[in-house]
Amino acid sequence: MTGSVWAIVPAAGRGTRFGGAVPKQYLHAAGQPLMAYTLAALAAHPAVAGIVVAIAPDDADWPGWTAVHAKPVLTCVGGATRAASVLAGLLALPDGVRADDFVLVHDAARPNLALADLDRLLEIGRGDPVGAILAAPVRDTLKRAGDDGGIDGTEPRERLWRALTPQLFRRHQLIRGLTEASAAGVDVTDEAMAIERLGLRPLLVEGAEDNFKVTTPADLARFEFELANRDRGGASREAERSAMPSAATSVFSGARSAASGSEEV
């Protein structure tokens, strides 16, 4: 299936695991905020028409980007939860986005998305009536813990997958799923959960294990290590990420450079 899609990035959260005042999506790696890599990875795909970023109402860290790779970047005020921020983003999409159009949702702090994974998700997901998510099969042995910290059992892993992002769904179905979950007091932890509550079955599209979410200092160090290897030409997927920003060059416009403080053009 051809045609363009818009992406939504919920970025109103203020994770506390790092212990600092700066939300994790704005922490720097190689001179750029994590979210710069996230947005650049999305906008690098030719099918992505633009991005809506849901930010906190008092967000003083948002760099004011208006475009990336010449794709428009819009903002809206997010909510107190991820689901509320995604819903706000869905409602803030431009007038030309129709109810049955597919929309991507991607974590702000998941900066290591490969173009090949996004391409495969769009190809498979847009060929399905419901949509699809990137996911990774569980490869570790899973233990069920008891209240005392002991092992109560071993869980079969053969049909278990870890949900990743982006996730791809039709706009009207995701609005309905998130709205109904909120009305029922259900805290959905990803968009697929909201779709599942409607009785729909999204597809699982296997994605790379290194499409990880940065939630701890160790995750940030891992991403910085991968960036360093990429700069030395040692990353196997370097060519896929040639459109990523760096401290010396930016693909953004409408904001000050994270590296130099100069105005982007």
UniProtKB/Swiss-Prot annotation:
Site positions for Positions MEP for the nucleophilic attack: 157, 213
InterPro entries: IspD, IspD/TarI, IspD/TarI_cytidylyltransf_bact, ISPD_synthase_CS, Nucleotide-diphossugar_trans
Involved pathway(s): Isoprenoid biosynthesis; isopentenyl diphosphate biosynthesis via DXP pathway; isopentenyl diphosphate from 1-deoxy-D-xylulose 5-phosphate: step 2/6
E.C. number(s) listed in UniProt: 2.7.7.60
Transmembrane segments: none
Record's compositionally biased regions (Basic and acidic residues): 231-241
Family annotation (PROSITE patterns): ISPD
Catalytic reaction equation(s): 2-C-methyl-D-erythritol 4-phosphate + CTP + H(+) = 4-CDP-2-C-methyl-D-erythritol + diphosphate
Residues of the site described as Transition state stabilizer: 17, 24
Keywords: Isoprene biosynthesis, Nucleotidyltransferase, Transferase
GO MF: 2-C-methyl-D-erythritol 4-phosphate cytidylyltransferase activity
Low complexity bias locations: 253-265
Start and end residues of each stretch annotated as Disordered: 231-265
Any GO BP: isopentenyl diphosphate biosynthetic process, methylerythritol 4-phosphate pathway
NCBIfam families in alphabetical order: ispD (TIGR00453)
Purpose of the protein: Catalyzes the formation of 4-diphosphocytidyl-2-C-methyl-D-erythritol from CTP and 2-C-methyl-D-erythritol 4-phosphate (MEP).
Protein's UniProt name: 2-C-methyl-D-erythritol 4-phosphate cytidylyltransferase
Organism: Xanthomonas campestris pv. campestris (strain ATCC 33913 / DSM 3586 / NCPPB 528 / LMG 568 / P 25)
